[in-house]
Amino acid sequence: MAVSMREVDAVFQGAGQKDGLEIWRIEKLQAVPVPKESHGRFFTGDSYVILKTTALKNGSFRHDIHYWLGKDTSQDEAGTAAIKTVELDAALGGRAVQYREVQGNETERFLSYFKPCIIPEEGGIASGFRHTEINEREHVTRLFVCRGKHTVHVKEVPFARSSLNHDDIFILDTKSKIFQFNGSNSSIQERAKALEVVQYLKDSNHEGKCDVGSVEDGKLMADADAGEFWGLFGGFAPLPRKTFSDLNGKDSAFSSKLICLNKGQTVPVDFDVLTRELLDSTKCYLLDCGSEIYVWMGRETPLEERKRAGSAAEELLREVNRPKSHIVRLMEGFETVIFRSKFSKWPKKADAVVSDESRGKVAALLKRQGFNVKGLAKAAPVKEEPQPQIDCTGNLQVWRVNGTEKTFLSFSEQCKFYSGDCYIFQYSYPGEEGEECLIGTWFGKKSVQDEKTTAISVASKMVESLKFQAVMVRLYEGKEPAEFFSIFQNLVIFKGGVSTGYKKFVSENGIEDDTYSENGVALFRVQGSGPENMQAIQVDTAATSLNSSYCYVLHDGDTLFTWIGNLSSSMDQELAERQLDVIKPNLQSRMLKEGSEYDQFWKLLGVKSEYPSQKIAKDQESDPHLFSCTFSKGVLKVREIFNFTQDDLMTEDVFILDCHSCVFVWVGQRVDTKMRAQALSVGEKFLELDILMENSSQETPVYVITEGSEPQFFTRFFTWDSAKSAMHGNSFERRLSIVKDGVKPKLDKPKRRPTTSSSHTGRSSVPEKSQRSRSMSFSPDRVRVRGRSPAFNALAANFENPNARNLSTPPPAIRKPSPKSPSSDPTKPPQRAASIAAISASFERPRPTLIPKSIKASPDVNKPQVEASKPKPEANGKDSTPSKDSPTVTPTIQEDLKEGQPENEEGLPVYPYERLRTSSINPVTDIDVTKRETYLSAAEFRERFGMTKEAFAKLPKWKQNRLKIALQLF
């Protein structure tokens, strides 16, 4: 039900429009804004409304509203705060989650807004207390108790020995010194977090200038700080063993109760199993879980009904005498994960992408019919491709798993994967602190379980041999992150497999082996973001495998087609041309535009049928969530840390950072060996539990990262200081050194990163990364000759300089001198180089075109293409073919070769450019639409393309297509 803004306090208009905090204090039953400089300062006699607005990656805002009640606040102010919270939610569109916060028992989410803590001050508006400024009052010795491993709850207690106990941590703030007393039963992590409160008191109460002392429970007068501390209490005396904590754990035995609110009346709802179907959109409900009460408000309920529901929850707490229980109010459709987890069945949220899918289908349909869909296609929101966060100039080594062994792949084979196999890769690259290393496993969709187990075991041993200073990642085909594709740059994934495990599995189960064959029929989908991030993936040889948003390569023996989808980009088309050099380097491809296919093309695909037009959806990176973990006997328990920072990563613990598209398991240096070995299992168990109820895939990438070896694609989620993860000691010792000395301790940085170990490779070196980059990517200015002989390709590969290095990598510390011939003269170019130049020049002569330009493309492709066009003589009668001694000139877009030579007319009619354009309002009919440029006159061709037709013909096919696309002739 729509809510009128007349029912909402005007002070809330415009709230929640930017990331950050907004706070209002209740003064005379009205909400009054609190200035930003006073945020985090609360008074025990007041009530507040706090709005936390978070900007999400999808461009929207998430709103969390809290109303905080001081222990001395009046009942009227508390009630007003609750009502104003409902009004603020209405002003925000009814999407916020609302929390009731009681002084001393605040939620961890609320406390995370005011790190490291909040310490309410005496005073209040209604009570008449005077708000004294810090610099107006004299220092009074105060004692605080601190509880919490990840978020600190601070409470002031009487300054007396009887307040101390063995379970908690206490901070004594005196005029000249701050003491931290660590109870013997407190953890290292709790002590480290309490030190953040010490730092806060030092900065706020002492202007950062006072001594800090640490006192360990059980240490007597021998310690100077301990002696001084106990002296303030009148001397040392034993503390009682058992103490009662007013922050006891939640009652796990409490049986949940569901109560329906109908016209001001409360009606219990009986149920055997709590399901979503019990909730009606026209009503409000209370779900009493003991330590918290949830108020669920149906979308169709009026504002007054929602206010009454909040009051009913407050009344329920008074009746059952649970004043410290939390109240969480939620609107239908915006329920929290914790609330949904209370139900045995909760429907999954559907992704709202129907409009984009429909738009793509309509655009593809119209384009097939010859309409210009440029505007329609652009109307769809473009999802940015994730950018790789890794240096791509490193050294790569790859192994294929064969049964229980691994087989090293040569440089030419390391980027050719099979879907039935498992692979292990090791990638060393320059990082911010030195060389970094990534060791990963890749599982094909049809790989066998035994080889997956072997891959994980071998990769784990490789990481262990490098003293856990390498990052480990487990990947599945189809779920690879951007970093993986950037490392491999030009990846081809074939069907089937060649490993012993796959072959054995196929044989034993009587399954047809569909392993790729060069002479068979195969269809590849080409994808990627650029020449150094492109993939060709073999798909089923069927029309249903096509997609209007991609380009495809289809071959059957010596027949080769390139299919261009109507919604594909010019970059997609360029990548398809480049992939031909990998899949079929010695064949000439026939380019087919969607809607202009040959009959033979459809015959190879079986039968013509419908196919999709929308790009294949990828898991999008969402806003990260950090969880602390405990894992024992196969049981994983997690606790979310809100508004996290690097300081939340404790060296004694294991944490999970969930970004939806991938999961990072961070392992502290002081984690025990057993837990460290189970890190990958922790990540897999986390995915299995689906903690955030996002329908996470078990094949989501899982990274295992050891403290001190954090890569940039992990640290980008934090404001990162690499020095912190390289500090001495445990969490408490590190923080104490900073608090006491005011500076960071001396660092002991490990040598990052270990060089490639020959024990895993069977060789002592790997190809230089510059060599790797050259062989896996192509310069856009390089003219590549399609169909040149394998002999020339091999010769060119052998003569590439393997010693040329990318400048981003330092040269080896020691370089052995190469042996020189006694007769060599360093001042003269070697004869070998001259010989290579001569041989290369002879190989680079322009090859005759396979299809004569005078013949139009015909659907009948079964006729042998044996006729070749002969070189035309120049005007002076000389043959235009260069001699062996003449250098080969490579034409570029701006060059105009042989300007004085008459144009080679092809016997075709000449039409003006405006009628040949694909978007022409008066298009020419009965022409070969794949060669629109050939119908231009020589003069207009030169005007439009900036070169002659001969120069254009000598360009690589992909460059020709790019020019034609730019001129709307493609």
Swiss-Prot record:
- Positions in coiled-coil regions: none
Q: Which GO terms describe its molecular function?
A: actin filament binding
Name the record gives this protein: Villin-3
Function of the molecule: Ca(2+)-regulated actin-binding protein. Binds actin microfilaments (MFs). Involved in actin filament bundling, severing and capping. Caps the barbed end of actin filaments and is able to sever them in a calcium-dependent manner. MF severing is promoted by VLN1.
Report the locations given in the UniProt record.
Cytoplasm, Cytoskeleton
For this chain's UniProt record, which GO biological process terms are given?
A: actin filament capping; actin filament organization; actin filament severing; response to calcium ion
Region (Disordered) spans which residues? 741-908
Encoding gene, per UniProt annotation: VLN3
Q: List the InterPro entries hit by this protein, alphabetically.
A: ADF-H/Gelsolin-like_dom_sf, Gelsolin-like_dom, Gelsolin-like_dom_sf, Villin/Gelsolin, Villin_headpiece, Villin_headpiece_dom_sf
Q: Where are the Gelsolin-like repeats?
A: 31-111, 151-219, 273-339, 416-484, 536-576, 643-714
Q: Which residue ranges does the record assign to the HP domain?
A: 905-970
PANTHER family, from UniProt?
Answer: VILLIN, VILLIN-3
